Amino acid sequence: MKQFLFAKKSIALRILGFITPVLLLSGCGKEEEVVPETHIVVEAPKVSVDEFIDDANKKLDVATLENNTAQWVYESFITDDTALISAQSSERFLNTQKELQAHARDYQQTSMSPVTAKAYTNLTKGRELLPPDKPEEISELAALGTKMSGIYGAAKYCKDGKDGKDGKDSKESKDGKNCRDLTALSDVMANSRNYDELLDAWTGWHSISPQYRNDYARYIELANAGARAYGFNDLGASWRSGYDMRAPDFETEVERLWTQVEPLYKSLQCKVRGDLSKHYGVDKVPLDKPIPAHLLGDMWSQQWSNVYSLVEPYPGVGSLDITGALVKQKKDAIAITKIAENFFVSLGLQKLPESFWQKSMLTKPRDRDVVCHASAWTMDARNDVRIKQCIQPNEEEFLTIHHELGHVYYFLAYNKLPMLFQNGAHDGFHEAIGDTIMLSITPEYLKKAGLIDKVVTNDQATINQQMRMALEKIAFLPFGKLIDQWRWKVYSGEIKPEDYNKSWWQLRTQYQGIAAPVVRSENDFDAGAKYHIAANVPYTRYFLAHILQFQFHKALCDAAGFKGPLYQCSIYDSKAAGEKLQTLLAAGASQPWQDTLQAAIGTRQMDASAILEYFAPLSAWLEQQNKGKTCGW
């Protein structure tokens, strides 16, 4: 089973794949696939390759339902019992994969039709986790994955210095008064402007992850053992093999895309640093140094929209109080989800199945621990689709549910395809779809949805709206790139366990221009404070999604016949845009992503030019604002 999680919004996506704990890219050095040295005695194939692929689809159909169900139960009701069920299910799924991968080797030199060849590629390349040869290592790998996710999901920071996980550390931690989970700590990061309060929340959450630093190092060993058993140098080589291009070419492509957007990011970082320095003082935010990581409104400094009030170009002009409107209108989780559903229905797509409303978890239960990380699920690869999200009436959750339903509608669009084709064209596509929809949440759309009364259109309002969007979209780009850059080097062995933390902060400073707010050491494990590390979820997909969503948005706006600046376009209520979107979704993973991109938007290459077009007004404004300043770090 795959998990796809979007960065800022804590968005997880569970769909068909081959593993519960997920990974995606890695290391340096030689990355071409090599002929594997195997311990399995390979006999001549007993069935044709077409029969083998048909059998693989059937086995995955059964295994996916069983495994997804076990993971759903665990993430929506975290106990020792459900953790055991989850781990055992993961182990069975890994063994199913191991069996299929072993048989797939028999057909390496077999000629195939294009359709069969694509299914075979989907089965054998780009796998996010490959099972080791030894059964005991498969069991250990599955158990470690469950353990790390469980620690993260149930973790609490207690002021008395205990982790609070078992609630037995003190009288205060027994009643929960002195302990805060990630949701509570994230609220502090989002809303407080007190330097010391923010520092306490940041250091508190980052004190959790050292618990599984050693487990993570062992997990890497086992994951690499599995990758080597199937002919890859390390797991990262497997990850990079899944993009319908040579692995080295993929790395080059990611770097090319970053080069396109890097100047805009650096301009944004310079302006934000200057405004934070005005608020906190130059002693706390020097104008020629990286920004302290706890001051950007987010636990990971990955998206900065929560500090908008400190950097707003023209205070109060054209402000959109989505949170205030949701609270005033008493919109609950179902009502908010209905608004998002209506967006897709307006494009000509189907209503959500009734089972969605019966089986989804849209609010946080009061009686148990759950993984609140918002996630979209397809349980049976047919019509049993669900959302797991702890929805509250605020802007972030409102945007998140639009994004999550993008995943759900992707599931529904390709649910008639064989299992090996039930996926995004590549993993960035799945994340991009939800965010493409979010780009259409314009002031005009919000007015049609009844959440604002009037739309203010002038240059100052435009710059404000673009700044708010850039704090989310542009601020994210280097973070989206660097997580797997770190992980690639961990998999390849270039980064040793004893250097995990030092190398993490080197990359964060290099790309983001941020720094740890307090002294860090190798007793810390700051990379592990991010869910996607704990749960081994790939991350480069989110960087790619941020590029693709603007490409998709431009193409859909063209289909809708929109005339005007790209940032003003909403495809809401456009059946023509809906048709093009459906074409993009329905292909699933049945063909190379380049073919899907060509059919949908007329190009075979990912490109960031649409981002630059979208943010052209802000880019010019930032250039003016930064004149005479020392930018960089």
Predicted stretch roles:
Residues 36-165, 171-218, 236, 530, ...:
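N-terminal helix-rich structural modules
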Residues 29-31:
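Bacterial signal peptide processing site
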Residues 396-412, 431-435:
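Active-site recognition of the HExxH zinc-binding catalytic motif
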